[in-house]
């Protein structure tokens, strides 16, 4: 357990040095919310319920950083076009606006690049909150579970258009 803890500390130092905010904010146990998050798929009403419940927890961040909207992204093996989307997400890129993810269920991998081109891969799991500042080079994929539910915060969806950097990158490896 000690090795994992020290690995996460070094990961935290790496991402902090490039401006990424990475915090662990476990959700308080709430039976109704837990039941929704346990479902593989959610209809629009289910998504709206999750956004309303979890959105209350991030109001301060919305005010502090000018985020005007939020939604819930739900990826699972049955998501139409999942493989094509993951292929796009996995290419190193930046955005004109911050990218904010609050992981509620499932897990994924974010790869972050420093100015020297070194990449650090982080596994994100429920309770992880990431704020990736505009211009930080990164990429994303799902783990073998191929499931994630994440609250997304944004100021302007146009700022989320990926600007691909053309950096060659090997397959992301799951950190130990």
UniProtKB/Swiss-Prot annotation:
Q: What is its EC number?
A: 1.13.11.54, 1.13.11.53
Positions of the record's site feature: Important to generate the dianion: 101
UniProt record, GO biological process: L-methionine salvage from methylthioadenosine; L-methionine salvage from S-adenosylmethionine
Reactions catalysed: 1,2-dihydroxy-5-(methylsulfanyl)pent-1-en-3-one + O2 = 3-(methylsulfanyl)propanoate + CO + formate + 2 H(+); 1,2-dihydroxy-5-(methylsulfanyl)pent-1-en-3-one + O2 = 4-methylsulfanyl-2-oxobutanoate + formate + 2 H(+)
Which residues does the annotation say bind Ni(2+)? 93, 95, 99, 138
Q: Is Amino-acid biosynthesis included in the keywords of this UniProt record? A: yes
Question: Entry's InterPro entries?
Answer: ARD (IPR004313), ARD_bac (IPR023956), RmlC-like_jellyroll (IPR014710), RmlC_Cupin_sf (IPR011051)
Q: Which CDD domains match?
A: cupin_ARD
List all disulphide bridges recorded for this chain.
none
User: Under the GO molecular function aspect, what terms does this record hold?
Assistant: acireductone dioxygenase (Ni2+-requiring) activity; acireductone dioxygenase [iron(II)-requiring] activity; iron ion binding; nickel cation binding
Where does the entry annotate site (May play a role in transmitting local conformational changes)? 98
Keyword set includes Iron: yes
**UniProt cofactor note:** Binds 1 Fe(2+) cation per monomer. Binds 1 nickel ion per monomer.
Tell me which residues bind Fe(2+).
93, 95, 99, 138
The record's note on quaternary structure and interaction partners says: Monomer.
Q: Which family does it belong to?
A: Belongs to the acireductone dioxygenase (ARD) family.
What HAMAP family does the entry give? Salvage_MtnD
Record's protein name: Acireductone dioxygenase
List the source organism. Delftia acidovorans (strain DSM 14801 / SPH-1)
Gene name per UniProt: mtnD
């Amino acid at each position: 357990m000690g090795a994992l803890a020290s690995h996460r500390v070094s990961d935290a130092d790496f991402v902090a040095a490039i401006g990424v905010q990475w915090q662990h904010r476990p959700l308080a146990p709430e039976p109704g919310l837990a039941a929704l998050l346990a479902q593989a798929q959610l209809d629009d009403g289910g998504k709206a319920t999750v956004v309303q419940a979890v959105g209350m927890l991030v109001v301060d961040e919305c005010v502090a950083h000018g985020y005007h909207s939020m939604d819930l992204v739900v990826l699972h093996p049955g998501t139409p076009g999942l493989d094509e989307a993951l292929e796009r997400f996995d290419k190193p890129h930046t955005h004109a606006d911050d990218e904010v993810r609050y992981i509620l269920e499932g897990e994924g991998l974010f790869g972050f690049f420093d100015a020297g081109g070194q990449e650090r891969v982080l596994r994100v799991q429920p309770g992880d909150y990431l704020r990736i500042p505009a211009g930080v080079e990164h990429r994303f994929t799902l783990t073998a579970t191929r499931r994630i539910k994440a609250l997304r915060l944004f100021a302007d969806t146009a700022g989320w258009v990926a600007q691909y950097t053309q950096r060659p990158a090997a397959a992301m490896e799951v950190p130990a």
